[in-house]
């Protein structure tokens, strides 16, 4: 039930472990900070991270006549979250499903969740170009996917896989809103200087190659990691950080590219 959603954005990456879920959660919190009503849908069925990252583990999902009611992070219901993590009895329980069952669950998430009026629905996806991604694109044909944000790290091994994700987007007709380079440099927690411990500018070169916007470069910042398990936005806790600056830039870009 996405008829009340103005903008649907999928967050993709061809490589696992690039911080895609962290980008999804902090982007959702940044959009909320800017006065938008936001939904965050975690369709990484085998590795749902969103409930943990927002400190929502153990929360219950309820059903009403219109379908599943998402978990809200605040009383004003400005951020709604849905994840298979809420349906598992134990965080360590594996999801051992074949493709058809995964497809059915994702279709339920996209059609049977009672999203109220939302300015943005952020969909956090698993890595790669699997059944899950194809199902999402098929289900979004009616309401439309307004674009994808692709997350990468600067290493060449990640960039190779992300190039495949770009090809997937082009073949399925997904508009690429831009590329975010994550884990580029390390921010010292004491002096806040940033040191490039890996190669750098991989996201910039990839954006140039794909002819899409480069939305920003995020460093490894231990202070941001401490926020995991809370609903605190980087914009509130670390307003002067590079991460907050980049997230603010992404929000401003989305406001100009999409319907507010």
From Swiss-Prot:
InterPro entries: Mrp-like_CS, Mrp/NBP35_ATP-bd, NUBP2/Cfd1_eukaryotes, P-loop_NTPase, YlxH/NBP35. The keyword Ribosomal protein does not apply. ATP binds at residues 14-21. The keyword 4Fe-4S applies. Heterotetramer of 2 Nubp1 and 2 Nubp2 chains. Component of the cytosolic iron-sulfur (Fe/S) protein assembly (CIA) machinery. Required for maturation of extramitochondrial Fe-S proteins. The Nubp1-Nubp2 heterotetramer forms a Fe-S scaffold complex, mediating the de novo assembly of an Fe-S cluster and its transfer to target apoproteins. This is Cytosolic Fe-S cluster assembly factor Nubp2 homolog. It comes from Drosophila melanogaster (Fruit fly). The gene is Nubp2.
